[in-house]
């Protein structure tokens, strides 16, 4: 479900995201990549959620914002497990940077591919964490 909603949100958000917000998140993700041992995890999850909320808001679709936002709320524990998997946070920041680059380039297809990669990698990290 996250794949479908996330890809739709990203596709709709291309061309609608304010450059200043994209730049702020880009700077933040690059800073986090330069300091991979940063903690606490709650702060990192807040950054991740804020970026997802920006994408949803910029989709311009109220229904999508509500449903996908609820899904993100309900999957918080899964997101915590995913982010605790070794190397997942850094991988996630790279995925977000790829998504930003695609959005900035007005490339909806590339943005959608990055969204799919992001969700697939998150799912795989959860599976590896709970079924070692």
Task: Give the residues covered by each predicted segment.
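Conserved amphipathic alpha-helical segments that form helical-bundle/coiled-coil interaction surfaces
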Residues: 2-10, 15-81, 93-102, 110-121
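Hinge/beta->alpha junction and helix N-cap segments in small-molecule ligand-binding domains
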Residues: 87-88
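Short, charge-rich amphipathic alpha-helical segments embedded
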Residues: 118-132
């Amino acid at each position: 479900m996250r794949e479908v909603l996330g890809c739709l949100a990203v596709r709709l958000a291309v061309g609608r995201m304010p450059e200043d917000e994209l730049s702020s998140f880009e700077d933040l993700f690059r800073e986090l990549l330069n300091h991979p041992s940063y903690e606490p995890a709650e702060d990192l999850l807040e950054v991740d959620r804020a970026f997802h909320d920006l994408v949803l808001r910029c989709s311009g679709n109220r229904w999508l914002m509500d449903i996908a936002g609820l899904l993100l709320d309900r999957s918080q524990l899964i997101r915590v497990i995913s982010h605790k998997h070794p190397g997942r946070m850094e991988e996630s920041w790279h995925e977000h940077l790829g998504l930003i680059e695609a959005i900035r380039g007005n490339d909806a297809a590339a943005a959608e591919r990055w969204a799919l990669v992001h969700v697939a990698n998150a799912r795989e990290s959860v599976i590896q964490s709970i079924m070692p």
